[in-house]
Amino acid sequence: MISNKIAILLAVLVVAVACAQARVALKHRSVQALPRFLPRPKYDVGHRIVGGFEIDVSETPYQVSLQYFNSHRCGGSVLNSKWILTAAHCTVNLQPSSLAVRLGSSRHASGGTVVRVARVLEHPNYDDSTIDYDFSLMELESELTFSDVVQPVSLPDQDEAVEDGTMTIVSGWGNTQSAAESNAILRAANVPTVNQKECTIAYSSSGGITDRMLCAGYKRGGKDACQGDSGGPLVVDGKLVGVVSWGFGCAMPGYPGVYARVAVVRDWVRENSGA
């Protein structure tokens, strides 16, 4: 009798564990369609831009590497001497003490200056399931000294529009999807902005995009941000218009990159960082 009860309890336990594992697997599959923003430490973050070219950090002196326990995790942009803007999915659920930024270097793993993060402010409306309001402000422990390779980026006005087809530059250390291209040096790609309705249609199967997002890329694909570029800058004429956020694959035909639209949170950025 006792042995039968034990057998039944073991069977129930096995079923419960199997169900829990299935739920975890389903959750992981549900985000694999958007691999650019898969968070660490559960998933690896890559190191290169797709279809781009090497640049010196002096060409994008606002670019930073967000480091998680001394390893490159995401990109970011200098707002002023104390604040950095990145993507909320890069910092959510992480302690500020685990984060630092490397500035003034074309290499994410060496050179320049490393400054620790003192405080993180994700946008209060950030939605981890839809990646809406994908913005995070990071306050640094010490003030930056500006130079030819460390400079704040200009910001748009609140709700300032970006015309369709505007050529942008996106930079970072994300995945190039090419074994022939080194992951050590900062890279960039020029991509045009995409009509909002066209981008919504492209991503209709995953719920489309919101007004807090903008898209950039070529219909034929070939150039895009990728894993490891998340949080980095999308810039037009020296002005930060987007933050690398998500997308279906990287540089895939018909699927432009999706960026968090900076102009919609301009007032929030100013109120919290003074930038």
Curated annotation (Swiss-Prot):
Location(s) in or outside the cell: Secreted
Active-site residues, record numbering mapped to chain: 89 (charge relay system), 134 (charge relay system), 230 (charge relay system)
Keywords on record: Digestion, Disulfide bond, Hydrolase, Protease, Secreted, Serine protease, Signal, Zymogen
Signal peptide: 1-22
EC number: 3.4.21.4
Disulphide bonds in the chain: 74-90, 199-215, 226-250
Reactions that this protein is recorded to catalyse: Preferential cleavage: Arg-|-Xaa, Lys-|-Xaa
Site positions (Required for specificity): 224
Residue span(s) of domain Peptidase S1: 49-274
Maturation propeptide residues: 23-48
Tissue expression summary: Expressed in the midgut. Expression levels drop a few hours after blood feeding and pick up again 28 hours later.
Function: Constitutive trypsin that is expressed 2 days after emergence, coinciding with host seeking behavior of the female.
Similarity comment: family membership: Belongs to the peptidase S1 family.
PANTHER family: GH13245P2-RELATED (PTHR24276:SF97), POLYSERASE-RELATED (PTHR24276)
Stated name of the protein: Trypsin-3
Gene: TRYP3
